[in-house]
Amino acid sequence: DAGLLGGGSNPGPGEVSLAHNGVLFLDELPEFRRSTLEVLRQPLEDGKVTISRAAGTVTFPAQFMLVAAMNPCQCGFYGDLKRECRCSPPMIQKYRQRISGPLLDRIDLHVEVPLVDFKALSSAEIGEGSSDIRERVETARGMQRERFAQHAGVHTNSAMTPRLIKKHCALDAAASAHLEHAMSQMNLSARAHDRILKVARTLADLGGTDHLTENHIFEAIGYRTLDRNFWA
């Protein structure tokens, strides 16, 4: 835990603070001790780490982007259409429960990555170029800088306060109804509700529009796949 958060008799920064304004990548997420993963909750929520010692309290900045990867089960083949999973249902459940619901709640995008077959790997077809993606992202970031120019400490949609979410994530009737249905069916928390709106706002920015639509909400909810089936 000290390596991740920081600590010691003379407290120093841990990995989360060293990743401040950058990316912290954790591979094989369930292989970390659950107690180690749980300490990520405070910095993910507050953007800082506070370490208390007898001599006093030290606070380190920790505004980082968490990127994590994991297998669907211990053998890695659960859900694979070509290879049989060797894990029993209790084994899969135990493996996945190493990641708590509250931590999962703080991760905005859940993406399931299917196996890429040989045909796709060897294909000569070229996808969207990184330069085009970068241009779109820079345009979206420019929209956000302009949007939050009068709000100190807020530079991106992810940092929006509840008041800013209400102001900049207004929904029409169709989008609101879709979000309400998802909240009920997936038993989502208030935190997940706000994070869905932030992601939807970003999707709209990437599309170059100020108006949030039902499609933006639908896509943002689609990125909460682990909320829907993680504990099934």
Describe each model-derived feature in a short phrase.
Residues S17, E31-F32:
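Extended, folded domain segments that form the structural surfaces/walls around functional sites
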Residues D1-G3, R86-C87:
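Short, flexible loop segments at the rims of nucleotide/cofactor-binding pockets, characterized by
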Residues N21, D27-L29, V39:
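Walker B catalytic acidic pair
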Residues N10-P11, R34-W231:
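Basic, amphipathic alpha-helical bundle interface domains used for macromolecular binding and assembly
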Residues A2-L24, T57:
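Conserved alpha-helical scaffold flanking the Walker A/P-loop in AAA+ ATPase domains
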